UniProtKB/Swiss-Prot annotation:
It comes from Homo sapiens. The modification N6-succinyllysine is found at K125. This is Pyridoxal phosphate homeostasis protein. Gene3D superfamilies: Alanine racemase. The keyword Phosphoprotein applies. Pyridoxal 5'-phosphate (PLP)-binding protein, which may be involved in intracellular homeostatic regulation of pyridoxal 5'-phosphate (PLP), the active form of vitamin B6. The gene is PLPBP. The modification Phosphoserine is found at S6, S226, S244. GO terms for cellular component: cytoplasm; cytosol; mitochondrion. HAMAP family: PLP_homeostasis. The modification Phosphotyrosine is found at Y69.
Length: 275
């Protein structure tokens, strides 16, 4: 049984990374032939982990890292050792982003992608903030969809997918829409068939591409975490977010203050974005 955190704890970050990458490639080989031939990206989720572990993973070839909290990402990405030793690092923000934290996120060094745009207002705020930053490149963004319909999870209803992508493409010239992201429900029993949340995201991409005349290989799917990344890749994920399987179990006693208001009723369940 593949248990999140066990491989890293026993063999170290380098061996854990190799094992995860091997499992990703095995899953790619099992994909249906009709899926877009996009090589999956491994996002190593380093939340609650020290900068030295990021540097260690970077030394073993990992380049893309993800964080859930703006303050932790800003501190880690600004760490002098990371800036010096990891010049090609790419940071993904994968947590819920409140509008009051947008400017802080845009200041993160080497920010590569925001995976969790979940409203038109947030897209507009990110667009204007990125413009003020003066970057020559557009910021890559994904739209987060609440495929499971759970109130505890953030993301747009599936029915609003096309409208927000149209808005980003037409009204947010500083953003580059690159895909759809979901967390989905946890603990799906694969003996009952494919994860319905993953299947829904696949169907949303198909509908989106058809209506907006976008090639399918230009719309990524970010789905799959430590517990289900192989299945996610098998059915079409192009971006898996894996943390404890690489870095070991997390110590949440050292977790920074979440980037949210006390009034945000979804906050206590935010750690469910796990990865």
């Amino acid at each position: 049984m593949w248990r999140a955190g066990s491989m890293s704890a026993e063999l170290g970050v380098g061996c854990a990374l190799r094992a995860v990458n091997e499992r990703v490639q095995q899953a790619v080989a099992r994909r249906p032939r009709d899926l877009p031939a996009i090589q999956p990206r491994l996002v190593a989720v380093s939340k609650t982990k020290p900068a030295d572990m990021v540097i260690e993973a970077y030394g073993h070839g990992q380049r893309t890292f993800g964080e859930n909290y703006v303050q932790e990402l800003l501190e880690k990405a600004s760490n002098p050792k990371i800036l010096s030793l990891c010049p090609e690092i790419k940071w993904h923000f994968i947590g819920h982003l409140q509008k009051q934290n947008v400017n802080k996120l845009m200041a993160v060094p080497n920010l590569f992608m925001l995976e969790t745009v979940d409203s038109v207002k947030l897209a507009d705020k990110v667009n204007s903030s990125w413009q003020r930053k003066g970057s020559p490149e557009r910021l890559k963004v994904m739209v987060q969809i609440n495929t499971s319909g759970e109130e505890s999870k953030h993301g747009l209803p599936p029915s609003e997918t096309i409208a927000i992508v149209e808005h980003i493409n037409a009204k947010c010239p500083n953003l580059e829409f690159v895909g759809l992201m979901t967390i989905g429900s946890f603990g799906h029993d694969l003996s009952q068939g494919p994860n319905p949340d993953f299947q829904l995201l696949l169907s949303l991409r198909e509908e989106l591409c058809k209506k907006l005349n976008i090639p399918a290989d230009q719309v990524e799917l970010s789905m799959g975490m430590s517990a289900d990344f192989q299945h996610a890749v098998e059915v079409g994920s192009t971006n898996v977010r894996i943390g404890s399987t690489i870095f070991g179990e997390r110590d949440y006693s050292k977790k920074p203050t979440p980037d949210k208001c006390a009034a945000d009723v979804k906050a206590p369940l935010e750690v469910a974005q796990e990865h």
